[in-house]
Amino acid sequence: MRQFAVTICLALLVACAEKPTVADTLPAPIVQPSLPVPMAPAPSSVDTPVLPTQTFAEWQQGFRQQALRSGVDAQLFDRAFEGVTPDMSVIKADRSQPEFSRPVWEYLDGAISPTRVRRGQAMLEQYADVLSSIEQRYGVERQVLVAVWGMESSFGQIQGDKSVIRSLATLAYEGRRPEFAQSQLLAALQILQNGDIQPERMLGSWAGAMGQTQFIPTTYNSHAVDFDGDGRRDIWNSAADALASTAHYLQSSGWQSGQTWGMEVRLPDGFDYALADGSSRKPVSEWQRLGVAALPGSAVPAGSENASAALLLPAGYRGPAFLVFDNFRAILKYNNSSSYALGVSLLAQRLQGSGYIQGAWPKDDTPLTRTERIELQSLLSARNYDAGAPDGIIGANTRKAIRSAQQSMGWPADGYPTHKLLEALRTQQ
């Protein structure tokens, strides 16, 4: 899990030997710039890199003193850092700003691919007893746990092969967020000191996410559990530990046992799309009063009639609409991306034979490139719609500015960045 994310909010003996397809192995993004603003705050992905003013050896010596003051054993520190040098591939990944992003419908195609669904159903059967025990203890449904497992590491097969110590040391030395990386590095050393894993086996992603459900070190220290009773919280090699740790985290994030994540809905003609920001919450009864209705043949889930929900439009007013409840928010705390939370939610349903979206995606409306998003932000601000810094990230300020511009043009104010809006702003120059 990542909370970097985040979590961001993770080697397993996988019984299913089927080789994953390309769609099945695509990593879930932390932030999908073309999606609504997540409900929980996420670290900026465009923080300015901190250029080192000292050598790596000098930085390491200073950090060693800090670690020892925090209770890390000197011999353990020296063993963990033996031969460690900066990993330039980590720096490259940290500073990468992709020009192109996938639209949400393509992301979801990978998240709930037939291969992933089949393998998830096989995992549900293989780990049925373990999952029953986890459900009983933490109250998180097994399909959700298996969905997270599949999204994060393809059921333990793709956990990352980088040294967590080296990656985090590199990021602490010259990454965009050195203080965050340093806190994670200190937490990683504490994991080693607790004896849960050896330094050479502590592998993960370039960002330091670890194990079968991709915990960052601080999240591991607060939520990882030894569910199989072997004395170690082994989220790398024990499916039971990884799944139970995920359940523990979701439980702590407000998971409501027996409740749904959300539901697809239809909106009335003339609906005020400014209400659909993915975070403003109203009782379901209030949404119904505004004309938001269940799809034909469906109904508000039992027990959710008086629940508080937000309205989510992942692809703007032309795409499907969803009311999302507390459990969706809990998934966002695991990984602060609306696309990720929607992927987990739909995959969990698909494992039970449901989770099919009825609304059509606006596939003729491809996402803006990073260069185009920066131009859009600059044009908005030039017209007194404060979009914030032109960084290519469509955050809260930019969406608010987009809504204001859309309202002034008499368009549906869904806050969704489109080529049509960009062209309209260009012609106003």
Predicted segments, located by residue:
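Sec-dependent signal peptide recognition
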Residues: 2-9
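C-terminal motif of bacterial Sec signal peptides marking the signal peptidase cleavage site
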Residues: 12-15
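Bacterial signal peptide processing site
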Residues: 17-19
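Post-signal peptide N-terminal segment of mature Sec-exported envelope proteins
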Residues: 22-54
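Acidic/histidine-rich, surface-exposed loop or edge segments in extracytoplasmic proteins
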Residues: 41-49, 61-63, 106-117
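Mature N-terminal segment immediately following signal peptide/propeptide cleavage
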Residues: 48-83
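Catalytic glycan-binding domains that act on GlcNAc-containing polysaccharides
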Residues: 74-306, 319-322, 328-343, 347-348, ...
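Short acidic, glycine/serine/threonine-rich helix-capping segments at coil-helix boundaries
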Residues: 368-373, 381-425
